[in-house]
């Protein structure tokens, strides 16, 4: 099955709406909510979001979805227009910088890491995912490992923190580590 931007956009918006609800209620995500959050794939390649917050007419095929997205961002921003604009800009900048890592690649890397650690009698004590997205590589960490995740995009960072509450999540670029 090929990539369908409308399906991806719809899943992203549903995940964001779910994340906003969880965040506003100040609680952790249920397993069912985590399944919804896990469908979030970011906005890499979904250029339609570049029209968010502009006077440009929205494409009829995505107008309803983009309006839902804007509503969710306004809710997350708590009515603060500057905060909402910042969230919109964060999403727009991710169009060119967000990348999806397929599960088969994550599985291959995980298998090699575990094989190398086992073969050499090593024990993982901490695990860093420097450009986390929604934390696809975090499950690579072995039991008892402290996990740290950096994610630059604000919305993706929120989804990440709700999916992996056991990891220390930093919503900032990896280049800020130690500052």
Regions found by a protein language model. Give the residues of each.
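Class I S-adenosyl-L-methionine-dependent methyltransferase catalytic core
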Residues: 1-179
């Amino acid at each position: 099955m090929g990539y369908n931007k409308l399906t991806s956009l719809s899943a992203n918006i549903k995940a964001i709406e779910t994340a906003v609800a969880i965040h506003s209620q100040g609680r952790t995500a249920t397993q069912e909510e985590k399944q919804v959050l896990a469908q979030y794939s970011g906005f890499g390649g979904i250029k339609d979001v570049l029209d968010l917050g502009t006077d440009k007419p929205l494409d009829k095929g995505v107008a309803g979805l983009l309006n839902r997205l804007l509503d969710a961002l306004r809710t997350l921003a708590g009515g603060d227009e500057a905060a909402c604009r910042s969230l919109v800009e964060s999403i727009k900048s991710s169009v060119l910088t967000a990348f999806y890592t397929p599960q088969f690649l994550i599985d291959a890397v995980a298998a090699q890491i575990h094989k190398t650690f086992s073969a050499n009698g090593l024990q993982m004590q901490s695990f860093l995912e420097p450009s986390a997205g929604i934390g696809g590589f975090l499950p690579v960490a072995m039991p008892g490992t402290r996990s740290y995740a950096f994610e630059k995009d604000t919305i993706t960072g929120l989804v990440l923190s709700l999916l992996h509450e056991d990891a220390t999540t930093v919503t900032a670029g990896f280049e800020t580590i130690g500052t």
